[in-house]
Each structure stands twice: as C-alpha cells, then as structure tokens.
UniProtKB/Swiss-Prot annotation:
Residues 133-186 form the HTH cro/C1-type domain. This is Putative HTH-type transcriptional regulatory protein Ta1363. Transmembrane segments: none annotated. One of its GO terms (molecular function) is DNA-binding transcription factor activity. Keywords: DNA-binding, Transcription, Transcription regulation. Residues 144-163 bind DNA. InterPro entries: Arc_TR_HTH, Cro/C1-type_HTH, Lambda_DNA-bd_dom_sf. Pfam families: HTH_3 (PF01381). The keyword Transferase does not apply.
Length: 312
C-alpha cells in the first residue's frame, strides 16, 4: 500500500511541477497531516495523498483543514480508490469535510475545468442553480406538477431544486433534456470549508502555550500544530501567515529544512523560537528569536520587521 501511495505522491508532484507550481515535498520526511505544499501565483494548496481515501482519519482531516486555513490555502486530498473501486474522474468526494479527487480530476481543476458532480449517500449529485431553474421553468410555462411528472419525482423535490438543492445525476440529465440551459450551481467544490475549525485543542507544553498567548497579544490568530514539522500556526486578518517552531537543544535540521521549504514556496515567514538567550539570529536561513525578546514585543509589525532583518 505504501508503495502505491509513494507512486501517487510522485505522480502528483510531477503533475504540479509540469503545470507551473512551486512545490514543497515533505512526504516521507515527517509524519505529517499533509504531504505537499504547492503554489502558482495566488493559487495555494495543502495536499494529502492517500491511495485509499477511506483510510482518512477525522483528526488528520481536521489538522489538514486547519493548516490550510492558516496558510490561506485550499486543503485537498488526491486519492486513487474508495471502498472497492477507483475514484471516478470528474467527481469530487468528501471525507470528514475535505474535498478529494483523482489525480486527473485535480489536474483538470487547476487547468480551469471545475468539476460539478460530487459523491454523496446513494450516488452522484449535482447542485442545482435554483434561480436559473425557476426562471427557465416559468419562461417555458411549465408547471411544477408537469416537471415533477416528467422527472419522476415529487412536487416537493422540484420545489427543493428551485431552492438550490442537489439532484441525482439521472434527474439532472432529465432536467437538461427538457430545459436546455445551464442549470448547474457553479460553486467551487474544492472550496467548501469544513465546519469544525473552532474545535478546542489542549496544549500540554507550557512553552507552546506561552508562545500562543504572546502571538495572540500582538494581534495574531493562532493555533497549535500537531503532526506537522512546526509547532505553531499564526495569521492576521489581512495577508500575514506564519509558521513557528520551538527550538530544541539540538536543532532538528530536517525540521528546519522543511519549514524553510514551506516558507519559500508560499513566500510566508517561518521562524524558530529559543527558550534561552542566544546569539544565533539565523539557522539555515530560518530566523531565530528568543522568547524573552518575543515577550517584549507590542505589535505584529515589530515581529515582522525582526523576521525580515534576521532572514538575510
């Protein structure tokens, strides 16, 4: 299974590079909730690759969604199979609120072909543009009763479609037969946001909690990071996104290299925080700030200025 997953990761990275993305590959280097960070101009993705999408755990999904939110990116999973069969191309699947697709579907998506079919209980569905349906039905002088009979559904179902509910593929195709117009609600199925972001997370490390409190005080929204190559996620309401890690006694070079990779791809700041006084201002291109200096700061701008200075 791991060999198949590794092969899919390699294919995904090659596809992203071929399509003009800058890529940070952290798969195999760290047991993280994501495998790939990618950016192309303003498009930013945090990707997890799974051979079988049914192996996704709720905790992994939450961490993936959280890091994507804080890095102003889209969380998505590239997979190959669900249950006993392959993922259908052109279809979006969801597990624990995270959008999932085949590699070919994701390739089409980043090249402008947005899928409009999604997998749900009992089959595949299309979200209907209710306003367009109502407008065309009235323009064609079709009653709700006539349309329900033609479609083989209840009058209530037609009313629900006109209020933006989804229809099965079979019903949608029948709708298209009689109403030859675009009836798809073109909501980006990759941009649907999970609703569990406010989940409370216990922080056992007193230093991590202290850092979260300091960053909150200077104007940043923060979250602890678990199963990631950093300890803290932070952002403001505008454009700032940060990742930070508590510096251990012996600097973890692999961890620092991964943070630097992510920082470089997304063009966001990554920095290390020392518990003790240190003369080091930079490790392998990653700025270092000691916790005492951080405590003295009164604004996020002060932090950003120091990061810019020490990143040189």
């Amino acid at each position: 299974m791991e060999d198949k997953k590794d092969a899919l990761i390699s294919k995904t990275i090659s596809m992203l590079l071929d399509n003009g993305f800058a890529v940070a590959d952290i798969s195999g280097q760290f047991s993280a909730s994501f495998d790939i960070i990618a950016r192309r101009n303003i498009e930013r993705y945090v990707l997890k690759v799974l051979y079988n999408i049914d192996t996704l755990k709720p905790t992994t999904a939450y961490q993936l969604a959280k890091v994507a939110k804080f890095l102003r990116s889209t969380a998505t999973i590239v997979g190959e199979k669900a249950g006993g069969g392959p993922l259908e191309d052109g279809v979006i699947y969801y597990r624990h609120g995270i959008p999932i697709s085949s590699l070919d579907t994701f390739r089409d998506y980043i090249n402008g072909e947005k899928p409009y079919i999604y997998s749900g209980p009992g089959g595949f569905y299309v979200k209907i543009n209710g306003e367009a349906l109502r407008e065309m039905r009235m323009k064609m002088s079709l009653s709700i009763g006539y349309l329900s009979h033609y479609l083989g559904v209840s009058r209530r179902s037609v009313s629900l479609y006109e209020n933006g509910s989804s229809a099965t593929i079979d019903v949608f195709l029948k709708l298209q037969e009689i109403i030859k117009s675009d009836l798809v609600d073109h909501t980006d199925l990759f941009k649907i946001i999970p609703d569990n972001f406010q989940e409370e997370e216990r922080v056992d490390d007193v230093y991590i909690q202290m850092l979260l409190d300091i960053l909150e005080r200077i104007g940043l929204d923060t979250k602890p990071a678990y199963r990631m190559p950093f300890d803290i996620l932070a952002r403001d309401e505008e454009v700032v996104s940060l990742i930070a890690s508590l510096l251990s006694e012996e600097a973890d070079k692999t961890k620092i290299e991964i943070m630097k990779k992510i920082s470089s791809v997304l063009e966001d700041d990554a920095f290390l925080i020392s518990k003790h006084s240190t003369t080091r201002e930079n490790i392998n291109g990653c700025p270092v700030i000691n916790i005492v200096d951080l405590e003295k700061m009164t604004s996020k701008d002060e932090l950003l200025r120091m990061l810019e200075k020490r990143a040189r």
